[in-house]
């Protein structure tokens, strides 16, 4: 009798995706972040669902409904902080996952890579709209400033911003539609994640060496399921440490003040995971001139496969490219720090230097070093 997991139509799909899936025998802990992102998504959907049961998307009651969740709902404070800090861990896993893709040359799987970029943009949009929902000072002013960036688009910009707002300023219509989109987008992300996995399983997974591994594969279960469970335990530990000991560590104190359109906070900034892009935006003292590099900070990812000049896929055996990659990684925390600082000297200058540095590494130095490395091994 055939095993049910190999004969049942639904169980067979699960079996081929998570149990009998042939996986390279040498993939490292950097390949754990895909499964961790799946866990983060499930966690965010579940905690978000419970929060939505008590949340009111009206400008008059939104702030007090969040207060009510924290004070009066059973374990409401825990659900709220799990959702907020879960988003931070989601982005940490996302950045690690993308970084691994760049380091080991996973971007050569073009369909998987492009769906991944679409996923990243959708998650960023979802997180931004979620930040607006508590209707604190930073929620209101963050929404005003970030949506206003679209007014830099020639001719249609102003109309586009007012269409998104649903009026002439961020108000009740904006909050209601942001809540609706914030609720539906995680389900769209789930569908995109399924497509991402579908394309990945068409080609098979990459591995640290960047070489074909068809001759050396092992079943996903039990080897990598155990490995993923270990990663999950570390993720839960990090989340619980944040939620139970420092729930507001990654938040903004201004968001504990109800939104007031008549009082601008001294320093408007988005959540920490957007600060690197925000620093690039502020480094150019021109609206359109700042918006274009700001957009390119993410939209450079689809261009990376075109800039791949090396005959080796992975950076693992390319010392010059390794130096450039780790300098790039070191530059991102600097940009994140600058994005959270006031717009004054010396932060403006540091931000400008870091922005030029990141673009020169990605657009020029990495491709040049790829060619140099080809010649150094006489390829």
Curated annotation (Swiss-Prot):
It is a multi-pass membrane protein. It holds the Pfam family Cytochrome_B. Heme b b562 binds at residues 83, 182. Binds 2 heme b groups non-covalently. InterPro entries: Cyt_b/b6_C (IPR005798), Cyt_b/b6_C_sf (IPR036150), Cyt_b/b6_N (IPR005797), Cytb/b6-like_sf (IPR027387), Cytochrome_b (IPR030689), Cytochrome_b_C_euk/bac (IPR048260), Cytochrome_b_N_euk/bac (IPR048259), Di-haem_cyt_TM (IPR016174). Its cofactor is heme b. One of its GO terms (biological process) is mitochondrial electron transport, ubiquinol to cytochrome c. It is found in: Mitochondrion inner membrane. Its main location: mitochondrion. Gene3D superfamilies: Cytochrome Bc1 Complex, Chain C (1.20.810.10). GO terms for molecular function: metal ion binding; ubiquinol-cytochrome-c reductase activity. GO terms for cellular component: mitochondrial inner membrane; respiratory chain complex III. The chain crosses the membrane at residues 33-53, 77-98, 113-133, 178-198, 226-246, 288-308, 320-340, 347-367. Heme b b566 binds at residues 97, 196. Keywords: Electron transport, Heme, Iron, Membrane, Metal-binding, Mitochondrion, Mitochondrion inner membrane, Respiratory chain, Transmembrane, Transmembrane helix, Transport, Ubiquinone. A ubiquinone binds at residue 201. Belongs to the cytochrome b family. Component of the ubiquinol-cytochrome c reductase complex (complex III or cytochrome b-c1 complex) that is part of the mitochondrial respiratory chain. The b-c1 complex mediates electron transfer from ubiquinol to cytochrome c. Contributes to the generation of a proton gradient across the mitochondrial membrane that is then used for ATP synthesis. Heme 1 (or BL or b562) is low-potential and absorbs at about 562 nm, and heme 2 (or BH or b566) is high-potential and absorbs at about 566 nm. The cytochrome bc1 complex contains 11 subunits: 3 respiratory subunits (MT-CYB, CYC1 and UQCRFS1), 2 core proteins (UQCRC1 and UQCRC2) and 6 low-molecular weight proteins (UQCRH/QCR6, UQCRB/QCR7, UQCRQ/QCR8, UQCR10/QCR9, UQCR11/QCR10 and a cleavage product of UQCRFS1). This cytochrome bc1 complex then forms a dimer. This is Cytochrome b. It comes from Chrotogale owstoni (Owston's palm civet). The lineage of its organism: Eukaryota, Metazoa, Chordata, Craniata, Vertebrata.
